[in-house]
Amino acid sequence: MSQQVGNSIRRKLVIVGDGACGKTCLLIVFSKGQFPEVYVPTVFENYVADVEVDGRRVELALWDTAGQEDYDRLRPLSYPDSNVVLICFSIDLPDSLENVQEKWIAEVLHFCQGVPIILVGCKVDLRNDPQTIEQLRQEGQQPVTSQEGQSVADQIGATGYYECSAKTGYGVREVFEAATRASLMGKSKTNGKAKKNTTEKKKKKCVLL
């Protein structure tokens, strides 16, 4: 879907990850500027957003997907012609980060070989939330740390690792600006291979802009 129309460049972004990890909220907040208060499982909704990076205007087609296993056979229909893939997990659900390695990276590499991947930690506002911390403690877990997220990003060969909160708006624009830049870079030959840690620790991201 690498097209250029007039002064605008078209790119396709696909977002994947476990159900209820924050994918749809992230897209809605970015494209519509509002946070949905009611959770409704996704069944492939598409959005279009205009993004300007480095003086270039990009028409970014945002393809949402459902993370539930019931949709494992339908989800691959969203992958063709993708220019960048966001793999999301939720900071308050350590299992969702584990599934990035157990499920999502294999699926993405199979259907989108060479396409840039960005790992996104959603719901970062819950990392220091007392109720979330206590609930996870009772289950013998704790919120995912930035270091754990970055480590997985390195292991799966992601172009970058970002954290955000759709609820507060923190980091949302940075995620999509990084994704847009990655989509303009073209296909990568390093997906799936470990990379050196290029994290800018203060900014919690590792895309070289």
From Swiss-Prot:
Coiled coil: none annotated. Changing G22A: Abolishes GTP-binding. It is an enzyme of class 3 (hydrolase). The keyword ATP-binding does not apply. Changing E102K: In RHO1-11; temperature sensitive, severely decreases beta-1,3-glucan synthase activation. InterPro entries: P-loop_NTPase, Small_GTP-bd, Small_GTPase, Small_GTPase_Rho. The modification N-acetylserine is found at S2. It holds the Pfam family Ras. A motif (Effector region) lies at residues 39-47. The modification Cysteine methyl ester is found at C206. Changing L60P: In RHO1-3; temperature sensitive, severely decreases beta-1,3-glucan synthase activation. It is a lipid-anchor. One of its GO terms (cellular component) is mating projection tip. Changing E45I: Temperature sensitive growth defect. Alternates between an inactive form bound to GDP and an active form bound to GTP. Activated by the guanine nucleotide-exchange factors (GEFs) ROM1, ROM2 and TUS1, and inactivated by GTPase-activating proteins (GAPs) BAG7, BEM2, LRG1, and SAC7, and the Rho GDP-dissociation inhibitor RDI1. The different GAPs regulate RHO1 in a target-specific manner. NCBIfam families: small_GTP (TIGR00231). Interacts with BEM4; the interaction is direct. Interacts with SEC3; the interaction is direct. Interacts with the GAP BAG7. Interacts with the GAP LRG1. Interacts with the GAP SAC7. Interacts with the GAP RDI1. Interacts with the 1,3-beta-glucan synthase component FKS1. Interacts with the protein kinase PKC1. Interacts with the G protein beta subunit STE4. Interacts with SKN7. Interacts with TUS1. Interacts with BNI1. This is GTP-binding protein RHO1. It comes from Saccharomyces cerevisiae (strain ATCC 204508 / S288c). The gene is RHO1.
